Amino acid sequence: MHCERFICILRIIGTTLFGVSLLLGISAAYIVGYQFIQTDNYYFSFGLYGAILALHLIIQSLFAFLEHRKMKRSLETPIKLNKSVALCIAAYQEDEDYLRKCLLSVKRLTYPGMKVIMVIDGNSDDDLYMMNIFREIMGNDSCATYVWKNNFHMKGPNETDETHRESMQHVTQMVLSNRNVCIMQKWNGKREVMYTAFKALGRSVDYVQVCDSDTVLDPASSVEMVKVLEEDIMVGGVGGDVQILNKYDSWISFLSSVRYWMAFNIERACQSYFGCVQCISGPLGMYRNSLLHEFIEDWYNQEFLGSQCSFGDDRHLTNRVLSLGYATKYTARSKCLTETPTEYLRWLNQQTRWSKSYFREWLYNSLWFHKHHLWMTYEAVITGFFPFFLIATVIQLFYRGRIWNILLFLLTVQLVGLIKSSFASALRGNIVMVFMSFYSVLYMSSLLPAKMFAIATINKAGWGTSGRKTIVVNFIGLIPITVWFTILLGGVCYTIWRETKKPFSESEKIVLAVGAILYACYWVMLLTMYVSLVMKCGRRRKEPQHDLVLA
């Protein structure tokens, strides 16, 4: 016991020193600004900080590639399908078409004897259509439904403690006694919905799969995740490859689709190589049920700065698994399609909410760095502090740099995006990934200020992604974007005013002309490809897209 405690202390000290040293090293490289290569007048330069970021991308891509090779080899691994699995679907104001597609895909799952529990966040007449769809798809004779006036933590009107306790027992018994169950309960957010499913199931099953009501599951998705959990008893949770169902509905959903592929098949695949996936996504994940019941109450009652957390449910669930010392994995062999916002404002609200949960969970996650591979510490430092370095770089360039410095920065952003997207195109075998370089502009213009706004309002839970039947009318997410563009525009105007006081030399004029032409040509080429390739593919929107999961 004393030996284990001593080793634990050493690991805490080691990971802390490693993380602090890494952050100080990167900060020093950024502040000193040592340049490996530079031309006269600093038309072009490549420094130590840039080399660190480039090395990170190379290492990340390498381990992602190695993890994908391991996934392919696991195809031949035989498993016994004798473990009990329950699928928990969280539903809230869902679009009828998406919900039907979700439930139809659930019926096609190949894992035998799977229990299905759909919990609806809301018990009003306006929510009843979701229960009716459940009955229609799953069959009236083979499912049990219940409209609950309350939930596990809130009483209904005029209800006593005794009747509340009886209703909880009724819900639990119904879940245990039936294979397909749909429950409508008093509204209290997604975490309440998930808690109901987990609590009612108890320890009656081996594995619990989670799913959102806008998700279309691949028939083999459950089998593939069970395979990962069966291969290693120290794996506590596993996530699958989440792709976009409505990717051709708008430019924002299309860019989200290429970003999703990168996030799962590069970033999470790399994390999976070291057994420390930071977030098992809500549309497609599976956990050991025995672990869930070790922390279900702490997970539900999570607080931050004195307030109970109402978002980031899936990320915190993953963090709870990591806190016990269990590994979390990703498998590209388990796939699903899910809906993503098609409107800019809804997307921005979603990203801000996700950024809030990321930074909040980053702090919680840091408590368990010592229980996992050093890569977990390394990546947390790199990705956690990168936005701050980037903002400092942009402001410095726009207010202290020259015109060609700003132009060079814009070209560099696109070049890095193009290199990363080219590797993704080769790995995926699909040229569509080249549009990932498009996403870099969206990141710089919208995600970066949204992240800063998320930190400033991290304890505010009053807005986020709304139900799909709700029109987004909250424009507060545009505030940081407006401030950010004002800062950038001010920098450009200031730089131009300063440059007019000193005539450009011939070499400066050439650099500006060539750079501007290259940048313009790049965008013309990319936009032409988008119109010719993506708009043509958009005609497939009317096809039954649940069949595209295997693509």
UniProtKB/Swiss-Prot annotation:
Enzyme Commission code: 2.4.1.212
Pathway: Glycan biosynthesis; hyaluronan biosynthesis
Listed transmembrane segments: 12-32, 46-66, 375-395, 403-423, 430-450, 471-491, 510-530
Pfam families, per the entry: Chitin_synth_2, Glycos_transf_2
Gene Ontology MF annotations: hyaluronan synthase activity
Chemical reaction(s) catalysed: [hyaluronan](n) + UDP-N-acetyl-alpha-D-glucosamine = N-acetyl-beta-D-glucosaminyl-(1->4)-[hyaluronan](n) + UDP + H(+); N-acetyl-beta-D-glucosaminyl-(1->4)-[hyaluronan](n) + UDP-alpha-D-glucuronate = [hyaluronan](n+1) + UDP + H(+)
Coiled-coil positions: none
Keywords: Cell membrane, Endoplasmic reticulum, Glycosyltransferase, Golgi apparatus, Lysosome, Membrane, Transferase, Transmembrane, Transmembrane helix
Top-tier EC class: transferase
Lineage top rank: taxon: Eukaryota
Membrane topology (Extracellular): 33-45, 396-402, 451-470, 531-551
Its membrane topology: Multi-pass membrane protein
Cellular location(s): Cell membrane; Endoplasmic reticulum membrane; Vesicle; Golgi apparatus membrane
GO cellular component, one term: endoplasmic reticulum membrane
Cofactor requirement: Mg(2+)
Cytoplasmic compartment segments: 1-11, 67-374, 424-429, 492-509
GO biological process: atrioventricular canal development; endocardial cushion to mesenchymal transition; extracellular matrix assembly; hyaluronan biosynthetic process; polysaccharide biosynthetic process; positive regulation of urine volume; renal water absorption; vasculogenesis
Family: Belongs to the NodC/HAS family.
Role: Catalyzes the addition of GlcNAc or GlcUA monosaccharides to the nascent hyaluronan polymer. Therefore, it is essential to hyaluronan synthesis a major component of most extracellular matrices that has a structural role in tissues architectures and regulates cell adhesion, migration and differentiation. This is one of three isoenzymes responsible for cellular hyaluronan synthesis and it is particularly responsible for the synthesis of high molecular mass hyaluronan.
Assembly and interaction partners: Homodimer; dimerization promotes enzymatic activity.
Protein name: Hyaluronan synthase 2
Originating species: Xenopus laevis (African clawed frog)
Phylogenetic lineage: Eukaryota, Metazoa, Chordata, Craniata, Vertebrata
